[in-house]
Regions:
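N-terminal active-site segment of His-dependent metallophosphoesterases
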Residues: 104-185, 488, 520
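A short, solvent-exposed loop/turn motif at the edges and junctions
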Residues: 52, 74-110
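Short, acidic Ser/Thr/Gly-rich low-complexity loop/linker segments typical of extracellular
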Residues: 38, 44, 54-68
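Binuclear metal-dependent phosphoesterase catalytic core
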Residues: 327-417, 421-424, 486-490, 496-513, ...
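Acidic, glycine-anchored loop motifs typical of Ca2+
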Residues: 32-42, 412
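A short, amphipathic beta-strand motif
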Residues: 24-30, 63, 124
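Extended active-site neighborhood of metal-dependent phosphoesterases/phosphodiesterases
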Residues: 94-103, 108-114, 181-274, 291-308, ...
Length: 520
């Protein structure tokens, strides 16, 4: 252990990270009576992983561990498969100890009070639980609530329909709030009603804006959720939460993976068997993230990997190869999840006063169920308050003159489509399915909604219509989950059914239909 700690001192110094001054010690144990204290009749657990945020060590045969710790570190146990950790009233894992002897900088939202000297022993309780290899999870991106009104949008639009769902746990991919960490408490209380453990990633709108620099900006997030980079295991899946939002002293932020977080990933992966699925989740997509090459180099030896991000308020699938540092088999699948807040809660309000919030790529606001079966996974995107099979929009005029029928474009926005999707079209009761051509285009309905902006600038009774009816939509973004094609040349006058099906290698297959009228 002396050599290991000395090596850690040298490495942290080379990285420009704070040097360590103390050694923390503790125990991981089976808490038989659920009192979160180690009692004489309870036993320590061997081989459980504990971390200080950079180094990961297993407990010894008696469940004991020791790690170097600085004066601004968080120590945590990595939940192993088949065990659970304590939760607080908001169902947030309580598997960590914050070591901040003098406390955090004072911030407007909740600060971290001085923790004082290290305890003699920092003990982490665990509890056994069954974890079948087949399980479901739910991933939220960017709930991004501005004020309690938008917290209520999250509740009405997403949380209420998830209560009682058969899921193992949930994840928020950052931007939990919109620049107001004081809202963590009400939004956590709401999400807790879903009834499952909930893990959280740090987003660029989850920071404390009243302090400068990277570490101080994380104050209320860490007070509320614990470490922003961490890991846990469930069944045959190793999950890694990665904080890739770095706040600068002069203001603003970068999307970059810190050296210390790369150290953590490297150290943790040394303990992960190669037959496991490794899933990373984070806020900013890896395509726009500094040091992604180093991260993917660490992941490349693992045959089963997958990652999820939010941030863009668009839905995308990327397959990252050598250009991003990936040297493994096939390419790394990186999924950019659609957001609960959609287009930042913009758009006309519906009959319940909730904005439609369609994203700028035409995907409705929503969240994803990600189902796991051993090392396999599938993604089921769910539009908020819409049927589960609402998976595409088919754009075509309803009334088409017969001479124009064969040249009238059918445009399909497949919400969860990717370059590996197969999208096909058929008409009426014909048995033949014709492939559609993938294209990059803007969503026609998004464009129409954007063109309402001048009307929303008008005032009625002294109030802008935008404040009364809903916020204006941005100009739509061009997206690649669009497909196009044309009707057959032999359509006759009358009503016809257009059928479109999406064969998805990463999720269930879906079919939808539209009716058109062809007239002489």
């Amino acid at each position: 252990m002396t050599r290991l700690i000395t090596g850690t001192f040298l490495l942290l110094g080379l990285l420009g990270l704070p040097s360590v001054a103390e050694t923390a010690k503790g125990l991981v144990f089976h808490d038989l009576n659920d009192n979160r204290r180690f009692d004489p009749d309870e036993k320590g657990l061997a081989g459980i992983l504990v971390s200080n945020g950079t180094e990961v060590v297993p407990t010894d045969g008696e469940g004991k561990w020791s790690l170097p710790v600085g004066d601004d570190d968080i120590l945590f146990v990595i939940k192993p498969s088949g065990w659970r950790v304590p939760l607080n009233d908001h169902r947030i894992p309580q598997n960590y100890y914050i070591h901040r002897p003098t406390g955090s900088p004072k911030v407007e939202a909740e600060s971290i009070e001085p923790t004082g000297s290290l305890p003699e022993s920092i003990d982490f309780p665990l509890y056994p639980q069954e974890e079948p290899e087949t399980f479901s999870t739910v991933f939220f991106a960017d709930t991004q609530a501005r004020g309690i009104r938008e917290v209520n949008f999250v509740i009405r639009d997403a949380v209420e329909e998830l209560i009682g769902s058969d899921i193992a746990f949930g994840v928020s991919l950052g931007d939990i709030v919109a620049d107001d960490p004081a809202l963590f408490d009400p939004i956590n209380a709401a999400i807790a009603q879903i009834g499952v453990p909930w893990y959280n990633a740090f987003g660029n709108h989850d920071n404390n804006k009243d302090v400068a620099g990277d570490r101080p900006s994380h104050t209320t997030f860490e007070k509320t959720y614990g470490p922003s980079t961490y890991a846990f295991e469930y069944a045959k899946v190793a999950f890694i939460a990665l904080d890739n939002i770095v706040f600068k002293e002069e203001g603003g932020h970068d999307t970059r993976i810190r050296d210390r977080d790369l150290l953590f990933v490297k150290s943790y992966l040394q303990h992960v068997p190669k037959d496991r699925l490794v899933v990373l989740f984070m806020h900013a997509p890896l395509r726009s993230c500094g040091q992604v090459e180093k991260l993917l180099d660490l992941l490349s030896p693992f045959p089963h990997t997958f990652s999820v991000a939010g941030h863009w308020h668009r839905q995308n699938h990327f397959f990252l190869g050598e250009d991003f540092g990936w040297t493994g088999k096939d390419k790394h699948h990186h999924f950019v999840n659609g957001t609960v807040s959609g287009s930042w809660w913009c758009g006309l309000q519906d009959e319940l006063g909730i904005p439609h919030a369609v994203m700028n790529d035409g995907v409705p606001n929503g969240y994803s169920f990600i189902d796991f079966d051993g090392v396999d996974y599938q993604i089921r995107y769910k539009a908020c308050r819409r049927p589960a099979d609402y998976q595409m929009n088919i754009y075509v005029p309803m009334d088409i003159p017969l001479p124009e029928a064969a040249t009238t474009e059918v445009l399909v926005n497949v919400f969860n489509g990717s370059e590996r999707s197969k999208v096909e079209i058929s008409f009426d009761d014909r048995c033949d399915w014709t492939p559609l051509e993938q294209t990059r285009d803007i969503d026609p309905e998004c464009l129409r909604m954007h063109e309402l902006s001048p009307y929303l600038d008008q005032e009625v009774l002294g109030a802008p219509l935008e404040d009364v009816l809903g916020w204006k939509m941005d100009f739509p973004s061009r997206t690649g989950h669009m497909w196009k094609g044309f009707p057959p040349k032999d359509l006759t006058p009358g009503s016809h059914i257009i059928r479109v099906r999406h064969i998805d290698p990463f999720g269930p297959d879906y079919e939808d239909q539209r009716i058109i009228r062809v007239h002489p």
